[in-house]
């Protein structure tokens, strides 16, 4: 489920519905705008378009506010100059709320990041982003403090800053084939400029893309969820005993060639459309060692398996990759091992967090994620169907 911005732009939502209508008409020429509007409302968790519009009005009438001291401290930490106006809330995301900060030296996007994202990680992600920007990928420019730091601790959290970039609507499923093609071209461009890495990928080592929880850990999660009286305990049991166990059986195949540092999380929420209908990549924080084959598999799952993807979206994405790279990494079931591991860990983490989430926003966000995980399950069968659809493209 998508989360509405803190001060939603109704014009953006109307544009999202129009874009969605184009995508719907790629498979059903008779699709009406009302169907696209219902689909937009549904993806934001509302039954009807009028319900969504009512929520837009409610949010705009009472946006979140930040302490004036936070704006001042952020501006001081990153040497941005004196604050001109109170910070404007942008949206609540999985790492926390992002804000628009205006100072005498410019306009900035500021947001918290996970504690494990320090300067070394941010520097790696920034180098990749700058290489990609130089190669034509649209992305905001990261900001360094006076001492060149990219991450600063402010008010008990780690923060990063980007120069403000005017962006258009979010991208919703199903995506237009032209957007899918842009995603493929963009991924190929990132792979083209990716830095070499001397890291060796070790299955089950610590890390979101490598570590897998033991049966005992899953049993403890189920027991804790049950003891807390959570209504989704039975859903968790069914997931664990069914699709998740089947996914764990997919074998790992080691990389033959050295790994590269790539974006590592090019999902549908990591992008926005720019005013010229060009794709902009706004999330680079997780950049790390990868293999083009594995990352293409990850992107295909996130853009063409999750959600209500159109038939042909995967082929359009792969065609876009070939447009830029000239060739496509061959894929098989083992190519999805990292994607599966990330899905297993995301599922585990969301059920853990939901058990003790504090605050209405955090609770609403994570419970929305649980609904999605339960309703739209990743399965081995879906991956096999994806591979079959792509033949003979890959």
Residue map of PLM features:
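Conserved NTP-binding catalytic cores of kinases and kinase-like/nucleotidyltransferase enzymes
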Residues: 61-147, 274-277, 388-394
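Active-site acidic catalytic loop and adjacent metal/ATP-binding pocket
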Residues: 91-104, 109, 142, 247-294
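A cross-family kinase active-site recognition segment
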Residues: 173-235, 257-259
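ATP/Mg2+ or Mg2+-diphosphate-binding catalytic cores
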Residues: 224, 346-394
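A glycine-centered beta->alpha junction motif in the catalytic cores
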Residues: 158-173, 219-227, 343-361
């Amino acid at each position: 489920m998508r989360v509405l911005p803190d001060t939603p732009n109704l014009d953006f939502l109307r544009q999202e519905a129009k874009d969605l209508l184009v995508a719907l008409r790629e498979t059903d020429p008779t699709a009406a705008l009302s169907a696209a509007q219902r689909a937009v409302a549904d993806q934001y968790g509302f039954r009807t378009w009028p319900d969504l519009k009512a929520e837009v009005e409610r949010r705009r009438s009472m946006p979140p506010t930040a302490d004036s001291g936070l704006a001042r401290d952020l501006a001081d930490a990153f040497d941005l100059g004196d604050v001109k106006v109170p910070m404007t809330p942008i949206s609540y995301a999985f790492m926390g709320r992002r804000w628009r900060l205006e100072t005498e030296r410019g306009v900035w996007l500021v947001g918290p990041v996970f504690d494990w994202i320090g300067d070394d990680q941010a520097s790696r992600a920034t180098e990749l982003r700058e290489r990609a920007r130089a190669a034509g990928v649209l992305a905001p420019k990261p900001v360094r403090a006076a001492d060149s730091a990219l991450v600063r601790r402010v008010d008990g959290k780690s923060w990063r800053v980007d120069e403000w970039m005017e962006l258009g609507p979010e991208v919703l499923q199903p995506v237009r084939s032209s957007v899918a093609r842009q995603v493929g071209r963009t991924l190929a461009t990132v792979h083209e400029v990716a830095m070499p890495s001397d890291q060796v990928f070790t299955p089950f080592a610590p890390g979101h893309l490598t570590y897998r929880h033991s049966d005992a850990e899953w049993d403890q999660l189920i027991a804790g969820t049950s003891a807390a009286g959570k209504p989704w305990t039975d859903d968790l049991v069914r997931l664990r005993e069914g699709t998740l166990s089947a996914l764990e059986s997919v074998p790992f195949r080691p990389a033959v060639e050295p790994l590269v540092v790539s974006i590592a999380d090019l999902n549908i929420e990591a992008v926005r459309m720019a005013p010229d209908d060009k794709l902009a990549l706004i999330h680079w924080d997780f950049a790390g060692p990868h293999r083009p084959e594995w990352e293409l598999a990850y992107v295909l799952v996130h853009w063409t398996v999750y959600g209500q993807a159109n038939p042909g979206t995967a082929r359009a994405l792969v065609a876009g990759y070939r447009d830029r790279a000239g060739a496509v990494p061959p894929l098989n079931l083992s190519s999805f091992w990292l994607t599966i591991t990330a899905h297993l860990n995301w599922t585990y983490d969301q059920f853990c967090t939901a058990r003790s989430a504090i605050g209405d926003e955090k609770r609403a966000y994570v419970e929305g994620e649980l609904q999605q995980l339960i309703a739209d399950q990743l399965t081995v069968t879906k991956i096999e169907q994806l591979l079959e659809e792509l033949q003979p493209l890959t």
